């Protein structure tokens, strides 16, 4: 946010907070467009890239249609929207929630902890001031998208998602695009050529997809997580006891959505977690996830043994009333599984998993998240918070991959999924971790089998352990593979993984690596229309439309910068070569020359054939006339 602000030197953060102008600039040659649905307030945002014309041989040009791409940046890249992080984003879903008439406004926060924070006057300079009263389902009600889907209701959120997944293309346009796309191999996925609102409803009703959208986060643009839709990417942000501030985390949020984060997890473990989260949610156009056990641990001064159900329950309500869209809950770490990790090379590497394992051993009791799971479901369905069932026993190195502890927990997560579904609570399953390439497919197969096709959400996996500083590369390989096999969402890894807290540039690097992985998975699955952007890039590359190449890229800034390092002049962006091969050895220029030469030969051949045909016809006419002049006789005396 334009530099770190010392909160001790200002009266209120709500008077000074601002977002970096770089984070709100539209992408080059791009504009925000909105596709309208069946009602005027269903306006689906996406990005449209303007392409330059193709120069033809005769000096004329041929227009190239603009390219639409999926956009997660929300209003931040729309110049028509005034951005003020002190007030938060427009509450786009509020009317839809009102129309359902199944919620009530509370008079204020009901969490004991939230109330205590509100009464603490020393926090006034940190508060997000423009708060709204939280909502909750009417007594005994259920407001989850899964509940509506199972009742046969197509919600505005579902319609929005169908338009968004299709990039507002008509069915005929997608069918036409599929003629220039490889069919792919989808390993049992069932994506139709054209996604309808009814298909979205069916997938949600079956539990194969989730729409994370807490009723207290109406600022979020509806999105879907499921293997029959585009593969999604999550970015982690959050402060720690060592570094970062509220304004830095909001800046990281905006930056992450700019570079393609479909969801963002706030993993804050430092000071002022409650206030930080409020600022993040109010300014987030994407769903926000958390790991509630982190904050619960802070409430008991970091002593895992002192955790209890009452503290955790209050934390769930606190975060649900703020608008958190999905909770990672490590309810599958059972007491009997903990000894299975003793022989591992790296033991338990999940923070949440280790916290619950320590609690279980200290009390010699079953995990209270497991024993109170149905009570957790009651809380979740009153706000439409989705489960992200945490893999607390995931492998922390490739030596521990696919072991007894990991798959025992996975089977328990499958059991918990069915309990959650009984309550109509949306559920996704978290996965590893560190897995070598030849063992990745087994993870996907086991998850589909035991978790009844609930969406899978994995951290990578990293396919080797020797890449510190480059873990976004090694995990991106695993992410692309498991996305192809059917994983619905990939949790990004940054270059700082295992090394430190990521900064803005690390967030971008991790996201670009994972957008590549997700897109590669879509291509490999043959997702309808996935190859449109690749084909547009290839055409621009062959025609030496350099500006279009930069603008179509996932990271236009870096593409342009790398080109300009060696060919900085504007005239070089019209050149039919780059610095890799130079003007004489450019394969595409040579190919164009070959094409031109072939076209010339064909023209000459056609001309020659035309001339020969003309001579033959003239000869035929002469012989015909000679026949007529001779009295039309077949034979003549010699």
Curated annotation (Swiss-Prot):
Belongs to the ThiC family. It holds the Pfam family ThiC_Rad_SAM. Its cofactor is [4Fe-4S] cluster. It catalyses: 5-amino-1-(5-phospho-beta-D-ribosyl)imidazole + S-adenosyl-L-methionine = 4-amino-2-methyl-5-(phosphooxymethyl)pyrimidine + CO + 5'-deoxyadenosine + formate + L-methionine + 3 H(+). Homodimer. Zn(2+) binds at residues 434, 498. GO terms for cellular component: cytosol. InterPro entries: ThiC, ThiC-associated_dom, ThiC/Bza_core_dom, ThiC/BzaA/B. This is Phosphomethylpyrimidine synthase. The gene is thiC. Residues 608-633 are annotated as: Disordered. Substrate binds at residues 236, 265, 294, 330, 350-352, 391-394, 430, 457. Residues 608-624 have a biased composition (Low complexity). Catalyzes the synthesis of the hydroxymethylpyrimidine phosphate (HMP-P) moiety of thiamine from aminoimidazole ribotide (AIR) in a radical S-adenosyl-L-methionine (SAM)-dependent reaction. Pathway: Cofactor biosynthesis; thiamine diphosphate biosynthesis. Binds 1 [4Fe-4S] cluster per subunit. The cluster is coordinated with 3 cysteines and an exchangeable S-adenosyl-L-methionine. GO terms for molecular function: 4 iron, 4 sulfur cluster binding; carbon-carbon lyase activity; zinc ion binding. Keywords: 4Fe-4S, Iron, Iron-sulfur, Lyase, Metal-binding, S-adenosyl-L-methionine, Thiamine biosynthesis, Zinc. [4Fe-4S] cluster binds at residues 578, 581, 586. The keyword Metal-binding applies.
């Amino acid at each position: 946010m334009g530099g770190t602000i010392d909160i001790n030197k200002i009266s209120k953060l709500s008077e000074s907070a601002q977002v970096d102008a770089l984070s709100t600039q539209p992408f080059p040659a791009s504009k925000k467009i909105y596709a309208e649905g069946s009602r005027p307030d269903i306006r689906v945002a996406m990005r449209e890239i303007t392409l330059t014309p193709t120069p033809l041989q005769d000096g004329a040009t041929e227009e190239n249609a603009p390219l639409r791409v999926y956009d997660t940046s929300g209003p931040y890249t729309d110049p028509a929207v005034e951005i003020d992080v002190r007030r938060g984003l427009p509450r786009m879903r509020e009317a839809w929630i009102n129309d359902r008439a199944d919620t009530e406004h509370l008079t204020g926060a009901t969490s004991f902890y939230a109330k205590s924070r509100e009464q603490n006057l020393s926090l006034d300079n940190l508060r997000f001031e423009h708060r709204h009263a939280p909502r909750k389902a009417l007594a005994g009600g259920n407001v989850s998208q899964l509940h509506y889907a199972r009742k046969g209701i197509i919600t505005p959120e579902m319609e929005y998602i169908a338009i968004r997944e299709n990039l507002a293309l008509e069915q005929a346009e997608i069918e036409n695009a599929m003629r220039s796309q490889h069919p792919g191999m989808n390993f049992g996925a069932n994506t139709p050529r054209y996604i309808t609102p009814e298909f979205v409803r069916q997938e949600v009703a079956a539990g194969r997809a989730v729409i994370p959208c807490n009723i207290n986060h109406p600022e979020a643009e509806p999105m879907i997580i499921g293997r029959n839709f585009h593969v999604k990417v999550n970015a982690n942000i959050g402060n720690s006891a060592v570094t970062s501030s509220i304004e830095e985390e909001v800046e990281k949020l905006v930056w992450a959505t700019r570079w393609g984060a479909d969801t963002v997890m706030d993993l804050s473990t430092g000071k002022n977690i409650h206030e930080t989260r409020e600022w993040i949610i109010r300014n987030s156009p994407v769903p926000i996830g958390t790991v509630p056990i982190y904050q619960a641990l802070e409430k008991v001064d970091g002593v895992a043994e002192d955790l209890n159900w009452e503290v955790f329950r209050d934390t769930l309500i606190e975060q649900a009333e703020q608008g958190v869209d999905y909770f990672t809950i490590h309810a599958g770490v059972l007491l009997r599984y903990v000894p299975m990790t003793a022989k591992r090379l790296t033991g338990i590497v999940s923070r949440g998993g280790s916290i619950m394992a320590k609690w279980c051993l200290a009390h010699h009791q079953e995990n209270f998240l497991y024993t109170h799971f149905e009570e957790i479901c009651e809380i979740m369905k009153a706000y439409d918070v989705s489960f992200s069932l945490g893999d607390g026993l995931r492998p922390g190195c490739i030596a521990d991959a696919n072991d007894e502890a990991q798959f025992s927990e996975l089977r328990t997560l499958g059991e918990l999924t069915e309990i959650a579904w009984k309550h109509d609570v949306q559920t996704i399953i978290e996965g590893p971790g560190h897995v070598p390439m030849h063992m990745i497919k087994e993870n996907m197969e086991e998850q589909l089998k035991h978790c009844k096709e609930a969406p899978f959400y994995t951290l990578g996996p990293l396919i080797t352990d020797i890449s510190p500083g480059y873990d976004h590369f090694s995990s991106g390989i695993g992410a692309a593979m498991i996305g192809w096999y059917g994983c619905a969402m990939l949790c990004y890894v940054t270059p700082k993984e295992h090394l430190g807290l990521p900064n803005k540039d690390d967030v971008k690097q991790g996201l670009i690596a994972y957008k590549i992985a997700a897109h590669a998975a879509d291509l490999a699955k043959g997702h309808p229309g996935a190859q449109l952007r690749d084909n547009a890039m290839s055409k621009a590359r062959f025609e030496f439309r350099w500006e279009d190449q930069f603008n179509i890229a996932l990271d236009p800034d870096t593409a342009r910068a790398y080109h300009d390092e060696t060919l900085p002049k504007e005239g070089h962006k019209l050149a039919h070569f780059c610095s890799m091969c130079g003007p004489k050895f450019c394969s595409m220029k040579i190919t164009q020359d070959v094409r031109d030469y072939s076209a010339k030969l064909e023209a000459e051949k056609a001309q020659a054939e035309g001339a020969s045909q003309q001579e033959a016809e003239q000869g035929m006419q002469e012989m015909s006339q000679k026949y007529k002049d001779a009295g039309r006789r077949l034979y003549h005396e010699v």
